[in-house]
Amino acid sequence: MMPHPDDARALAAQMVCFGFDGLEVNAHCARMLDLGCGAVILFARNVASPAQVARLCAEMKRRVSPRKLLVMVDQEGGRVARFREPHFTTIPSAEAVGNAADAVHAARVVGDVVGKECRAVNVDMTLAPVVDVNTNPNNVVIGDRAFGTTPDAVGAAAGAFIRACQSRGVAACAKHWPGHGDTEEDTHAALAITKHSLARLRDVEIPPFVDAVKAGVASVLVAHVQVPGMEAPKSENDAEKTETSTPPASCSAAVVSFLRERVGFGGVVMSDDMEMGALANAPGGVGQCAVDGLHATVDLFLACHAERTQLEALDALRRAIERDVDGSGARRRATEARERLRALADAFVDGADAAEANARAIESSAGGTTREYVGAPEDARRVRDACGTTPRL
């Protein structure tokens, strides 16, 4: 008996994370929520104040209740921070954290503050930390977003950030698997390539991700980076490959299976933004990339801006699930994704009632301020003392 079409749509929609413009639930947002999208990502365009963010998230969660909605934000610190002064604590760049006298302590403090402030405004996940190793001075994407230039330094700081952030009830996300630190292309504009052998990747790029997994990280984000060294190498000491015919990591079964099987990560794997220029010329477009990612065991696909792209990904996933009559391919993968997403939600995602309580607490705080919850002078002092300087954006 064929499954009901709505079942396929529900399985597909829960794998789509969408973004939208505006400070409240608008028509675009409402449509994606009503379709059953499992996650939403906020940007600076969605932020006016802590009370407004908390209320926005509470309204989105109420709209989909009793289903849970994962709300995420890029709150790395430095140049990638959607929550900023004057309302939120200024978080320094990962480079500044890594340069502190006690980088592990500094990362722990920063992770604690990020987790505290995200939870206060009903955000369930921060897309941090970056666990790339900054080994290429010409890399315009990573640079000061990395904790350091060695795997040990990056892994130690990342582990401290993850544990502290998640102890506040906010999921962390290690990125950008399997390493974006030694690339020169900006994947926002073009497809990048990591030309190293598997042996080199195991020595430099992969160890910080191992540390992140050992720290219990809830999610790993996969980059739109070609990694020919992971595509069935003849030996671990293969000469460096330069072929550009390999798929992006976000669509590669070989790259994602290495994370799952060799690194031992059993949590949620998500793609980088499907609207990035890196996928602009991909065969089959965003839809085919999403289907390829599904078969590679990617659980969640980010489509951060255009409703058209979000629907393209959702519809392609739905069609793939509907075509899988015996349930051995796309349907099985989507069902596995649902279970991993549910496990993350059980651990970190607030439901509608808890979100409403958070929103009311901030809205009713004395004098209309929120310093008890976010932007506390004490937290600014803790960050400043740990990092040894006034944080710079």
Task: Enumerate the language-model features and the residues they cover.
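Short, conserved phosphate-binding/catalytic loop or strand-edge motifs used
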Residues: 131-141
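A charged helix-plus-loop insertion that forms the helical arch/lid used to bind
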Residues: 87-103, 146-148
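Preference for extracellular/luminal or secreted protein segments
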Residues: 1-36, 252, 262, 280-393
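Second-shell residues forming the walls of enzyme active-site clefts
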Residues: 6-8, 19, 31, 45-65, ...
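Alpha-helical scaffold segments that flank or form the walls of functional sites
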Residues: 99-123, 205, 288-295
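Catalytic domains of carbohydrate-active enzymes, especially glycoside hydrolases
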Residues: 31-43, 113-125
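Short, conserved acidic/polar surface loops in the N-terminal third of protein domains
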Residues: 81-91, 137-139
